[in-house]
């Protein structure tokens, strides 16, 4: 199962896992996007799910018979420093990025533990370093990293739990940011985003998905509790 699976990194992960033979469940609140992707992936299931709704999450997982892999990818962003951040926006970010991951993970545990499954959480370099004007977002991604490590400590023999921390990746998430905050200078700001990463470009969703595939595979049996950056060198210096 991939949450936020209808677009961006989530969609790329669904495609990559399906190509490797996984029976994928695309979990997303975006019904049209999830259905469109499912038509590309024979055998893929669609789960329309608001991950912040505890009752809906519990009911959804009660209907699932087996689960080997959970990719917690769903998330939202917010631009603003501490002085520009409203409590309602701060709370909403934590509801989706942190509480949502908690609810899904908790509901999935009765399925993942018997299968000795794997959880991959999609964090961000924003959880590792300060990013200007991303106060709430940095806080939520720091929490994702902490939850990853804690789960790995609690379940060392039964479950593998890892976190991927991407830099800026070329997804609809970035497109929406440019449209909302830089409508009249998109290309200029996109160029700045490229240069923020020493490699000189944005990441590709498929690159994140390939790392997720590795972490879910038997080749990564010795990998748990790890926080892995894939950021074009952003955090190297």
Please state what every model-predicted region is.
Residues 81-82, 86-92, 193:
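Substrate-binding pocket helix/loop in short-chain dehydrogenase/reductase
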Residues 85, 130-138, 150, 177:
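Active-site loop-to-helix junction immediately N-terminal to the catalytic Tyr of the SDR YXXXK motif
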Residues 105, 140, 148:
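Active-site helix of classical SDR
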Residues 110, 152-157, 221:
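Alpha-helical segment proximal to the catalytic Tyr-Lys
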Residues 124:
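Residue(s) in the substrate-gating loop at a strand-loop-helix junction
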Residues 129, 213, 224-237:
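Short C-terminal tail/terminal secondary-structure segment
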């Amino acid at each position: 199962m991939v949450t936020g699976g209808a677009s961006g990194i989530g969609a790329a992960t669904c495609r990559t896992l399906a190509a490797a033979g996984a029976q994928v469940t695309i979990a997303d609140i975006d019904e049209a996007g999830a259905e469109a992707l499912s038509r590309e992936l024979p055998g893929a299931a669609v789960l329309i799910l608001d991950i912040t709704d505890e009752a809906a999450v519990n009911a959804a997982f009660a209907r699932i018979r087996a689960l080997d892999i959970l990719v917690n990818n769903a998330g939202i962003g917010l631009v603003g420093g501490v002085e520009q951040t409203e409590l309602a926006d701060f709370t909403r970010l934590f509801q989706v990025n942190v509480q949502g991951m908690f609810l899904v993970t908790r509901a999935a545990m009765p399925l993942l533990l018997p299968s000795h499954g794997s959880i991959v959480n999609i964090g961000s370099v924003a959880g590792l370093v300060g990013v200007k004007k991303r106060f709430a977002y940095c806080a939520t991604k720091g929490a994702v990293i902490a939850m990853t490590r804690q789960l790995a400590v609690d379940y060392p023999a039964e479950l593998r739990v890892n976190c991927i921390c991407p830099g800026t990746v070329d997804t609809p998430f970035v497109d929406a940011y440019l449209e909302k905050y830089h409508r009249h200078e998109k290309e200029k700001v996109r160029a700045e985003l490229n240069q923020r990463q020493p490699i000189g470009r944005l990441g590709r969703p498929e690159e994140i998905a390939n790392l997720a595939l590795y972490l879910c595979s038997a080749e990564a049996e010795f990998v748990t509790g790890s926080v892995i950056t894939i950021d074009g060198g952003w955090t190297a210096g």
